[in-house]
């Protein structure tokens, strides 16, 4: 392919050179592209997308999208390096392609699952539902880089179900659609990747639902939306064509009705976090995050949007350049400052693109090799890297100067007072305060800065006349209480975070004023565990538990507690939302009570897990009754339905944040039973996992059901038995060793227990079984390397103990039925030793090791323990378990 433009561009791009050299760019397609600005019409004409969708040819769709990206990126590189295009063309072209790719993948995924499950229908409007995709960040502002990932959020209009024979809830349907969309774009194949897809900006991040309804999004933004999320949503843009109400519900969250000067502190804080990371990681040469970089230009534009956008709709824009221009037009910023920022922004973005053109990598760091530096300088129009560096620094210094002028820290104030009040004064004596803080063991500067942030912050300054004196009275007491802890700085930081969190709820401030005896207890709890501190921040209503007489009472009467919960649910009068909130408040209270007792050393890990499992059992039983009562079109008063627990729930090894592995079974001859109980299963799962105003209950995992994600949500007991006998894999029988009946119809319990016993006591070829389990262990190594610091997956760690026990059950329960009792791994090791199946000494050592591992895992979560330290004691435990493994299996699993 001969073209001077190609020769010039390939000199500055290894990526382009590779595409040209390996023949991946056909001249008849590529050369005409170089003479025009690409549009959606060009993307549409590249392949017969309708045919691919009609044929449900997923592999071909993925291939064509990746091939199209190769052409688009190569075209952008050639035109930009040759100065045919400008920054706006580059960013708009790649963003338009991202929009096209998202919509093409979405159309395919939607049609694929619509054909499988029917069209999703709104519960209230009774109209077909479509998924809206919101592009965030640079994708939202038409500002993508060629090697950017894309930040997306998935939103659908309303809850409901599909209208097909294999009915699915809209939440499940759109989750599947979203997952396939992500895979089509994100998966790396032989043809490469379309875009890295980042979903972490969605509500609750990685822990949140992949898709959510508009109502759920609105509720989240109102009740939980944080300042940084306002910043993120400022650029949010719906890239799909379907009707939606997203803009109207997001606008009041991002753009407040008043002049929101709290945005200054929020933006400073965000910038400090970024600056800290930049400093920590030595990223001064990062033209995006370093001083005077792209991010500072973006912050300047967005700070004025955050403050004034609610009153000036003209500022409710997506792009950085258009926002800066509008700031000049409206007189908010001097025109000369805006021109300075625009020139710097264009220069920095051009540099960023050239860094990424080199090898199609998402980088913003200047090169270190002389050769690449010279090439970069030449591509930017400079004769030498030194001249380029001088030009770059001029732009960065100007940006940083303007940034510091606009977002400078407020002046510190000083004055004094007496006793612990010295810690919280309008004008503190800084020298005295720092000295006293150091005297009491605090990181003085960190605490003083935090106290000043609170006093100067939006929340404190806008407290009511009643709330502010209460707030003022609590701060010195928190400082005093934190000083008594082993880690005063961390403790006080958490207490102050909590106080600020609850400050708008005057009732919580009044509680702390009225019950000062709880402050020391609160400090002790928060000092010991950032997890409990976060839990209290999430559910501050739990403060009331601190004055409960039962707080440290370890005598949990679950039957009595279940009865009390039942009464509370009945009092809701059938109000679904009220019942869901009641379940959540009950569960949160018991978890908090257990956590406080745990911190006080009143529980072993094993006993605590028993209590957390009993709590889950109680919640599941209550939720099942509520979900059935809430079901329309049911054919009987009492469901012939049961819940079986697997994994940690089944083995009674739940932790505070464990999800629930569930399998739903039914035994009902009614012709509509399958449909009815599938809907019940879906409804029950929603009852458990949906976040309401009172929070959430449990994350659920239903993948251990027959046929996994491809299987029905609920199975008849007959189908379950048939599957276990004829189709289940060995690993599914391993899972069955930890399964137990939780709640539901007694007859199903009897049938399940029988099936479990018969399956686990079936005659097996022990050599073949051993080989399969070793192979299963080997399959874990690529995704979970057996590092010694990971007590779960290390050789001789938690998984090895579990596999040993599971093998002993599957191989020997026929002869020793006492192995069938679900007592947990520690007890089962002892039983196996008593049966003569394993050496008693090794069994005892492995029990000790397993207890040690569980304590390590538990403390990492609860007590802020660092990553497990590889000590001689730990290695000795690994060694003992490995000895037992070799005794049982004769060989260890191979890593390769």
From Swiss-Prot:
Gene3D superfamilies documented for this protein: 1.20.120.1510, Beta Polymerase, domain 2, Nucleotidyltransferases domain 2
Pfam family, one: GlnD_UR_UTase
Keyword field contains Transferase: yes
GO CC entries: cytosol
EC nos: 2.7.7.89, 2.7.7.42
Reaction catalyzed: [glutamine synthetase]-O(4)-(5'-adenylyl)-L-tyrosine + phosphate = [glutamine synthetase]-L-tyrosine + ADP; [glutamine synthetase]-L-tyrosine + ATP = [glutamine synthetase]-O(4)-(5'-adenylyl)-L-tyrosine + diphosphate
One GO BP annotation of this record: regulation of glutamine family amino acid metabolic process
Region (Adenylyl transferase): 417-896
GO MF annotations, alphabetized: [glutamate-ammonia-ligase] adenylyltransferase activity; [glutamine synthetase]-adenylyl-L-tyrosine phosphorylase activity; ATP binding; magnesium ion binding
Family: Belongs to the GlnE family.
Protein name in UniProt: Bifunctional glutamine synthetase adenylyltransferase/adenylyl-removing enzyme
Species this chain originates from: Neisseria meningitidis serogroup A / serotype 4A (strain DSM 15465 / Z2491)
């Amino acid at each position: 392919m001969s073209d001077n433009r190609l020769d010039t561009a390939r000199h500055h791009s290894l990526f382009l050179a590779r595409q040209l050299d390996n023949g991946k760019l056909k001249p008849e397609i590529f050369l005409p592209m170089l003479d025009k600005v690409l549009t959606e019409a060009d993307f549409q004409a590249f392949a017969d997308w309708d045919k691919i969708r009609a044929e449900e040819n997923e592999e071909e769709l993925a291939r064509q999208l990746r091939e199209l990206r190769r052409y688009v990126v190569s075209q952008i590189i050639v035109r930009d390096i040759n100065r045919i295009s400008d920054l706006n063309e580059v960013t708009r072209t790649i963003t338009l392609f991202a929009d096209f790719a998202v919509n093409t993948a979405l159309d395919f995924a939607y049609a694929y699952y619509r054909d499988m499950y029917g069209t999703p229908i709104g519960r209230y409007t009774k109209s077909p539902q479509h998924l809206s995709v919101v592009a965030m960040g640079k994708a939202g502002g038409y500002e993508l880089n060629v090697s950017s990932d894309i930040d997306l959020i998935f939103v659908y209009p309303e809850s409901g179900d599909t209208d097909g024979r294999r009915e699915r809830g809209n939440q499940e349907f759109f989750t599947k659609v979203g997952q396939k969309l992500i895979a089509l774009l994100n998966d790396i194949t032989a043809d490469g990747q379309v875009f890295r897809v980042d979903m972490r900006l969605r509500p609750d991040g990685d822990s949140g639902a992949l898709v959510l309804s508009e109502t759920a999004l609105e509720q989240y933004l109102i009740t939980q939306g944080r300042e940084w999320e306002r910043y993120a949503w400022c650029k949010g843009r719906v890239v799909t064509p379907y009707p939606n109400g997203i803009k109207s519900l997001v606008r009041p969250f991002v753009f407040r009705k008043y002049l929101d000067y709290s945005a200054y502190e929020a933006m400073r804080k965000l910038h400090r976090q970024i600056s800290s990371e930049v400093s920590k990681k030595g990223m001064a040469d990062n033209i995006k995050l370093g001083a005077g970089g792209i991010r500072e230009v973006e912050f300047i534009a967005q700070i004025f949007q955050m403050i004034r956008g609610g009153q000036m709709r003209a500022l409710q824009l997506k792009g950085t350049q258009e926002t800066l221009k509008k700031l000049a037009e409206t007189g908010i910023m001097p025109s000369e400052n805006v021109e300075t920022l625009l020139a710097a922004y264009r220069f920095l973005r051009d540099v960023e693109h050239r860094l990424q053109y080199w090898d199609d990598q998402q980088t913003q760091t200047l090169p270190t090799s002389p050769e690449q530096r010279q090439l970069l300088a030449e591509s930017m129009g400079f004769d030498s890297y030194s001249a380029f560096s001088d030009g770059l620094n001029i732009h960065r210094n100007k940006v940083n100067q303007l940034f510091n002028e606009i977002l400078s820290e407020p002046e510190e104030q000083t004055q004094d007072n007496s006793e612990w009040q010295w810690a919280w004064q309008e004008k503190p004596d800084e020298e005295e305060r720092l000295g006293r803080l150091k005297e009491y063991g605090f990181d003085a500067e960190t605490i003083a800065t935090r106290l000043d942030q609170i006093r100067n912050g939006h929340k404190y300054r806008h407290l009511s006349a009643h709330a502010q004196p209460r707030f003022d009275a609590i701060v010195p007491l928190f400082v005093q209480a934190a000083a008594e802890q082993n880690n005063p700085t961390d403790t006080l930081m958490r207490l102050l975070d909590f106080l600020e969190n609850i400050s708008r709820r005057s009732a919580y401030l009044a509680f702390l004023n009225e019950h000062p005896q709880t402050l020391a207890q609160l400090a002790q709890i928060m000092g010991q565990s950032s997890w409990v501190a976060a839990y209290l921040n999430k559910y501050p209503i739990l403060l009331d538990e601190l004055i409960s007489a039962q707080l440290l009472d370890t005598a949990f009467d679950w039957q009595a507690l279940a009865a009390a919960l039942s009464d509370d649910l009945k009092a809701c009068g059938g109000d679904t939302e009220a019942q869901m909130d009641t379940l959540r408040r009950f569960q949160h209270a018991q978890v908090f009570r257990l956590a406080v007792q745990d911190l006080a050393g009143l529980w072993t890990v094993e006993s605590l897990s028993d209590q957390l499992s009993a709590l889950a059992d109680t919640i599941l039983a209550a939720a099942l009754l509520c979900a059935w009562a809430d079901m329309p079109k049911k054919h009987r008063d009492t469901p012939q339905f049961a819940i079986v627990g697997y994994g940690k729930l089944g083995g009674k090894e739940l932790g505070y944040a464990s999800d629930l592995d569930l399998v739903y079974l039914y035994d009902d001859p009614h012709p509509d039973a399958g449909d009815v109980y599938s809907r019940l299963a879906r409804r029950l799962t929603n009852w458990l996992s949906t976040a309401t105003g009172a929070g959430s209950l449990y994350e659920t995992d239903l993948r251990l059901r027959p046929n996994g994600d491809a299987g029905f949500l609920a199975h008849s007991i007959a189908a379950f038995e048939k599957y276990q006998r004829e189709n289940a894999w060995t690993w599914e029988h391993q899972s069955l060793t930890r399964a137990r009946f939780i709640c539901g119809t007694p007859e199903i319990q009897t049938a399940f227990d029988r099936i479990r016993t018969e399956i686990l006591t079936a005659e097996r070829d022990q050599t073949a079984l051993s080989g399969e389990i070793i192979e299963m262990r080997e399959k874990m190594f690529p995704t979970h390397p057996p590092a010694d610091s990971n007590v779960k997956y290390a050789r001789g760690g938690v998984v090895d103990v579990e596999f040993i026990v599971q093998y002993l059950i599957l191989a020997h329960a026929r002869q020793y039925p006492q192995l069938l009792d679900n007592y947990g791994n520690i007890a089962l090791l002892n039983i196996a030793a008593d049966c003569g199946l394993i050496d008693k000494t090794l069994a005892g050592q492995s029990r000790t090791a397993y207890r040690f591992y569980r304590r390590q895992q538990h403390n990492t979560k609860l007590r802020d323990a660092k990553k497990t330290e590889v000590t001689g004691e730990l290695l000795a435990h690994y060694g003992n378990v490995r000895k037992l493994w070799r005794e049982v299996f004769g060989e260890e699993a191979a890593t390769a």
